[in-house]
């Protein structure tokens, strides 16, 4: 547990150091016209926006958005920077800029550490007075508020989400006269029926490599129907007996029998390959893979389809809490009203349509969700229904814990040990619960 503690405290300490050096070159005594984004003058106002992990096609979108801002607001010039590389590269660049006082007005990587340390502006007042606020998904807004220790502050305006789903080979199911399974019992029956080892064909593929813990968490809670990660006494629910039962079926009984042996080390890339090349009947991922799935199967939905997770033991579908994300405003920005105009323009129907189709995300804006691509593209329609909460319950995934992803990383080796028979499901989940409880207790002590 010392590892989790050290990671948590180090992250919070570094965040404090970063904010300590943050001036952003700001001058809060600038003119009222500048504070209002030049709303009442012809003065040109510059707003800076850094976007994370921008590829060539994404850069084209952001270049278009910069032009669109000036088209709608002639007095606002958007200084748009698409940062290539990984999310870690972006975070390193941003942290250095914060310390140097050169951080941008808008960022699109929402982090709880920067909420707690005051880097982000609280957007509650802006949002409450925004005429289009009712178009934005309540579930996404509430999810973003979990990054505030009080649960009340909105520090990023959500622009979309990538719900998780079950990718299915519907043509394989047709061969055994089955529909897409809507219960876990049917799912486990189907993977057995679909498996033909002599043909190197398996009912499903398990993500045993990088990212395994994140996927497994979602599936366990989907199976059990539990929607809270902690009880009233701060005890973790991840080691609930229903989760032990699921791991027995999924990691022990299915692995090696209805899955390939090399699933032990598969990351998403290998999982997608197994599904698309006809070696696995089911895989679990998010809608970000929708475009590659559609291309691999040439948009032939008689061969593949997205589906919600099967119903839980309680008779309803459980989806992980939607990941907090959105556009945040630098609390040291000199032109906050202009910044807000840019942020809300990003949430407009036209921009949301373009963004959602490019990134494979369901828009936060309901008008954009009602457009053709999101209503008539099979996998996006599934995601849209999830975001709108149709027959879905969301659990309270603790994304707000600074060490949450570190706990997941620690568990990946233990998951492989369980698949290999060197650890029992009970041992895995008890250790997982202990780490989560420690992370929560330390967070609450720090937050209070």
What are the roles of these predicted feature ranges?
Residues 1-48, 71, 430, 434-448:
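Short, low-complexity disordered leader/linker segments with a strong preference
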